[in-house]
Amino acid sequence: MLVMGGIVGSGIFINPYVVAQQVHTPFLILGVWIFGGMVALAGALVYAELAARRPEVGGQYAYLRDAFHPAVAFVYGWTLLLVTQTGGMAAVAVTFARYFLEITHAPVSDAVIAAAALAALSIINCLGVRAGSNVQSTLMLLKIVAIAALVGAGLSVARPAQNVSAALLDRPVSMSLVLAIGAALTPVLFAYGGWQTTSFVAAEMKNSTRDLPRALLMGVIGVIAIYVSVTYVCVHVLGPDGLKNTSTPASAVMRAALGEPGARFIAIGITISTLGFLSHGMLTAPRVYFAMAEDGVFFRSVAWIHPRTAAPAVAIVLQGVVATIIALSGRYEQILNYVTSVDFILFGITGISLLIFRNRQPESTGFRAPGHPFTTLFFVISCFLVVASTIFKYPANSAIGLTILLAGVPVYFFWRKS
């Protein structure tokens, strides 16, 4: 549940329409989601072996520190706090708030609701990993019910959308098609993002060498099935043209199948989904800031552990404060545009770290990624192709993200010197 809850947020309910704006046949739309799932699955295999080799607090932070240099790990934690994790959480919190207000019509702003959600989940996760994971498991079960209802309702629409092209491709094989597929992969992989954060809590699992790889693999495969099913019913009911012209495809599918009550039901489901994503982020990522403090490259107080709950309470609160500030600032849309480029640079570098660990220690008694080095190289190459595509599509926003990433290098050495 922890892995699936970290992936299934608001993206699958919105991003199919973004994909349909880039590629225009059912084959390409579904194919992009399947390919994105393969990238996520390859990444899960890589991270599963890394977690088995390095079951430490901080997950990806520890892998980068041990494979390369503490500066590389610091830059990862720096961008996690300032861009990728908190920025994504702020945007999802506002998405939650908007759907919440659509249901309740409460006389408050979406920013206030978003801030309240972030604060409440910060408090819950300060109670410890067990309390946080119980909330996460409950929300994931509710999400599965909502998604099952969406898929079931979509399949019940007996008459598919008219004028659906039977062609596999919407244009000849060319650089234009490649760039369109690359652009479509950006929202797909953003929707698949989150599986890697489960490795942050590896040190807190009773048997992480056995349990974490299994959780990653089963979780990612489950999400692929969910995402492809949801995308299929969107194409089945709306058709590629209808899909690309609605920014709320899940509501459109439910409205076609069950009328306004159906659309309202799925709005509640999306609200639950986004709340679950926020719960997962609050539960996992603060372990990275804790690990940075333990290494002496961040405020020592961030390493404080609550004596009763054993949770890194200061780290959790810090992340919640930063995410709340971003949510209240209203600049979350811009941050989302460059989250992907920064995220996948670090994913690719982390994939390279497995090649380094395999070279240093060829033998390992724990989990070993099947198909290595081909699986690992597929993941690494895919990551950097996504980065190149994102920079090409969103050069200005990518430049902002890369600037923040690179700024972490002098900050690290300043921190070490001081």
Residue ranges and their predicted role:
Residues 62-63, 69, 102-106, 172, ...:
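TM-loop-TM module centered on a large, flexible mid-protein loop between adjacent transmembrane helices
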Residues 301-313, 347-397:
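C-terminal membrane-solvent junction of multi-pass transporters and transport-like membrane proteins
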Residues 26, 30, 107-109, 138-268, ...:
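Helix-loop-helix junctions that connect adjacent transmembrane segments
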Residues 12-18, 93, 124-130, 160, ...:
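Transmembrane helix-loop junctions in multi-pass membrane proteins
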Residues 18-20, 40-118, 122-126, 131, ...:
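Hydrophobic transmembrane alpha-helices that form the core helical bundles
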Residues 147-150, 289, 339-365, 382, ...:
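Hydrophobic alpha-helical segments of multi-pass membrane transport proteins
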Residues 158, 338, 342-343, 371-418:
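A generic transmembrane alpha-helix motif of multi-pass inner-membrane proteins
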Residues 1-27, 40-45, 56-57, 68, ...:
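Membrane-interface "cap" regions at the ends of multi-pass membrane proteins
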